[in-house]
């Protein structure tokens, strides 16, 4: 009947749909089971439920449509809440590997509403912990630049505005905007300081409580808080044109000095930055002194004597630019003590000039000392290099070296200085730890070393050892790097320049070697059976100035001592190269192997004889020691026996005689 009423043939899908009404009738029971079902069962995917609802016939869907919609909404809501909780509770495995155990939060528990709130709080705290600035990072340095700007603004313009009333009144709206913008930056800096990490046991601390305690208990925190006290509120009592009420903003100076220190460390031109920094300090002092001079002149009275600022009623001296430039000129002459200024008249003027002279002497001494030291540091490398040249010149003159050779040596030194190749890498890097030296050497030389055929597919540890042993060498035009028949003790890698393989006449060129090429690597391995042996097979000459890296045979053997497997790999690699080039005599290799076996047997026999001799000597020493020990034991036994007999006799003589019989 079902098939006829539907007008279609029965199918598995239709048969399945026939059972749907029964399922719908049991919705109430299903809902109760769903509420009592464990959490693990409730976590099943709802896709099957959606599919089951979609497969229902239209009439059946209309009969229980509202109930199914309600149930579907409930299931979707439950599924969304579950995924939301899982998203918050899921730990970041990548970050957890780098965060300390004290920062790892416990996974949120799924349960009632209170547990959800706790989980949300912990998740928020966990995310908040990630926003910790590393004081050695780039973002912290950029923030130092941001905070240094308002600090420098306050240090320069607050004093000027307090002294020059025209400057304060003429641009009041500009100062109002800049003042409160700097206040916002100050407040932001206070919070950033609370989120700035520090190192403890070599690890960056990210615990908010530790960060807060580390900052709050410092003097800098007190100064930072004092610098953001809203003293501007006093404007309502005394008027808005009193910028001296904001002098507490000057207490935030430490951040500017910290920015200067970090910039000096980061910059590639530290000497130039030190000079610029020193000039900035001097200009700020001169600026402050000019402002104070104008303020003193205002308090005494403009134009009352020759020392103070002229009367501002005079049009020549009555505008702001002339006021500041005149005071700045007077301050510069006074502090540098290089010009004549009007003499003081009143006592307070004398005291101020005396104070200025003392400050000027300190400034002059600081300039001379710092600039002289900086110039000496800047010229230290040049002076050391020039001393080497002078020593070589003196030696060549003493030994009466030819002018041509002397000119060649001077040109070689000139090439080194012009191309900045005078630095001794080992001397410069000797103060670094071995690991850092290795990393620098790897970054500089590893790609070059990998170009050598015998070092391809070599063990990484051995390559690191070899990289540390590469020595740069510079050859002049026409210099022979090696000659045919010379014993090969080094291998060379060309960094820059052109080398030519020439005939014995030194003119005919057979081949040209450029940057990245290498030669001499086979000869330093001393591979047995090589037709070349350890001798050079060609003349190699530098066409111009050439920069090469040199690796000596002794350094290679010292490095492979700790890597015996790598040594075998290198020798095998060298044999393969020689075989490809037809330079390996297999008969000689076999003969050398037989010779090696015989030598090993002879060495073994020698070692056995040596061991036998040593064993015989030790046995003789052991026998002699046993005899001496037995003799000493015998002597001790005799002495013990004699002592026992003597003690027995002495005891018998000292015992009392038997008492005589009593008389009747």
UniProtKB/Swiss-Prot annotation:
3',5'-cyclic GMP binds at residues 520, 523, 536-537. One of its GO terms (cellular component) is non-motile cilium membrane. Pfam families: CLZ, cNMP_binding, Ion_trans. Residues 597-651 form a coiled coil. It is a multi-pass membrane protein. PROSITE patterns: CNMP_BINDING_1, CNMP_BINDING_2, CNMP_BINDING_3. GO terms for molecular function: calcium channel activity; calmodulin binding; cAMP binding; cGMP binding; intracellularly cAMP-activated cation channel activity; intracellularly cGMP-activated cation channel activity; protein-containing complex binding. InterPro entries: CLZ_dom, CNG_cation_channel, cNMP-bd_CS, cNMP-bd_dom, cNMP-bd_dom_sf, Ion_trans_dom, RmlC-like_jellyroll. Belongs to the cyclic nucleotide-gated cation channel (TC 1.A.1.5) family. CNGA2 subfamily. The C-terminal coiled-coil domain mediates trimerization of CNGA subunits. The olfactory cyclic nucleotide-gated channel is an heterotetramer composed of CNGA2, CNGA4 and CNGB1b subunits with 2:1:1 stoichiometry. This is Cyclic nucleotide-gated channel alpha-2. It comes from Oryctolagus cuniculus. The lineage of its organism: Eukaryota, Metazoa, Chordata, Craniata, Vertebrata.
